[in-house]
Structure formats: C-alpha cells, structure tokens
C-alpha cells in the first residue's frame, strides 16, 4: 500500500524532487565529502567512540543518528514485515526496528510483524533488556553464528510463518569479508524485488586500520569488500548499491552499504 498517495500534494512532490537535486549536488561536492570523511576519522572507532553516546528508547543503539534516520526512511518506503539483525549487542537496534514495525502495524500498513536477532553471544544484560522493554518483548533472538545452518533455518522458519514476507536484513555481526559475503550469499535470496539489505560498518574499508581487532578485519578485508565480491556473483547481479543514500548522509558508518534488489 502506498500511503504517500493519501497525503501527497504537488508541493510535497516538488520538495522530494528538490531532495534528489540536493543529493546530486552533495554527492559531487568534493569538499563536503572530504569534510565528512575527516569528521568520521575524528569521531570514529578509536577516537571519541561517538556512536556509543546515543540511545534508542533508553537502550544503547551504537549507531550514528543520521544512519538511524535513513533506516527509518527505508523502512517507511519498503514497509517490511520481517526485520533480521545479525549482531545484537545491547539490543538497541532490535528495539528500533521493532518500534518502526509497530508504527507500520498501528498504521495498518502491515498486518504481521516479526523482528529477529542473531548473535554469537546473547549476553545476560541484553536478555534482561529484551525481556522487559516494551519494544522488545516479542523479539526473537538466536544465539549462534549467523552463517551456521541452524541460524539459517531459524531465519527461514520465521520468515515462512509470515504471509507474503518482505524481509529486511541488517548485517552487523563479524565484519570480515568472508563472513559478510557468506551472510549475503545465504540471505539475499529471501529479499524480494525492491527490498534491501543493509550492511553495517563498511566504513572499516576507508577508516579502519589493518591491525584492527588483531587483524580480524580492516581495509581490504571488510564488509565493503564483501559487497564488491558478492555483486560479482549471479545473485549479486540482482542488486544495486543505493549510492544516493551514502551521498545524502555524508557522515555515515555504512558508505556504499545499502543494497537494493532490482525489479526484473
């Protein structure tokens, strides 16, 4: 259902067209893009730990605020009824995604709602949060690796329980190229035409260090390189990188990390 048609107007349409024009200018504004990169370096992983300063509904989100804003836009436009997050941490992401789907459900834009989490370690304090937080009580979490068969079966079973599923995947677990590429290979086939996969922390490729976390990942071995490899596969050729999202954000932890399934 395109709810935008209910309240659309020539003025709103014109405003959205202007957004597209502004994004194009920002994308081609070398100085703006360079300032964004420099700011990320100052705020990044090993400097101020800036992303650790924000909460969603009282839970650490560990996200740049503008990245959350653009995810809200993706969710509103795509209207998924299943969201799967790989890498749970504190659970702030799960709270965010479930609250967004609760809004869609309340607005009668979706009739079913599921939010799933997968993490190699489902920590006790996170379990307590998810059990008691009003946005998280019906969230389901699987403890294990996102690329194990058991995790895949967990995702498949839950997706198949939804009528006409429209899953949105958020990959934010282990950030090595091989791991993320395997996640993409496993879960991309579930995504319908026009659907999205959000690959977090692609900024590691451009702002990370070769010895980060004991060289478990870094430039040349990152979520961004995983996307490049995946896009060369038969399944990957069905997707495109949503470059306009990176351009509009300027400051982002997921440059080139949003991929969209093409309509055939």
Question: What are the roles of these predicted feature ranges?
Answer:
Residues 2-36:
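N-terminal auxiliary segments of SAM/dcSAM-dependent transferases
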Residues 1-12, 80, 178, 245:
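Intrinsic structural disorder
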Residues 29-40, 187, 197:
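Short, solvent-exposed beta-strand-terminating loops
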Residues 17, 21-24, 34-41, 131-132, ...:
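Polar/charged alpha-helical tracts
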Residues 19-26, 30, 39, 46-47, ...:
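Short, flexible helical or helix-coil boundary motifs
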Residues 37-63:
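Class I SAM-dependent transferase core
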Residues 55-59, 66-264:
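S-adenosylmethionine/decaboxylated-SAM
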């Amino acid at each position: 259902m395109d709810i935008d048609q209910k309240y659309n107007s020539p003025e709103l349409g014109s405003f959205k067209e202007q957004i597209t024009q502004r994004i194009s200018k920002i994308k081609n504004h070398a100085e703006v893009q360079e300032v964004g990169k420099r700011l990320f370096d100052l705020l990044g992983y090993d400097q101020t730990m800036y992303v650790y300063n924000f909460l969603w509904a009282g839970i650490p989100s560990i996200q740049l605020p503008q990245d959350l804003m653009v995810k809200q836009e993706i969710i509103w436009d795509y209207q998924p009824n299943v969201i799967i997050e790989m890498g749970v941490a504190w659970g702030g992401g799960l709270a965010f995604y479930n609250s967004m789907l609760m809004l869609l459900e309340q607005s009668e834009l979706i009739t079913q709602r599921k939010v799933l989490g997968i993490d190699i370690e489902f920590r006790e304090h996170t379990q307590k949060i998810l059990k008691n937080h009003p946005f998280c009580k019906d969230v389901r979490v699987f403890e294990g690796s996102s690329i194990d068969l058991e995790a895949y079966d967990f995702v498949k079973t839950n997706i198949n329980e939804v009528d006409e599923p429209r899953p949105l995947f958020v990959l934010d677990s282990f950030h090595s190229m091989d791991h993320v590429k395997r996640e993409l290979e496993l879960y991309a086939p579930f995504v319908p035409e026009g659907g999205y996969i959000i690959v977090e922390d692609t900024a590691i490729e451009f702002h990370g260090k070769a010895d980060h976390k004991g060289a478990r990942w870094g430039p040349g071995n990152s979520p961004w390189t995983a996307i490049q490899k995946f896009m060369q596969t038969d399944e990957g050729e069905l997707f495109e990188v949503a470059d306009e999202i990176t351009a509009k954000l300027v400051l982002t932890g997921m440059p080139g990390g949003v991929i969209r399934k093409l309509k055939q």
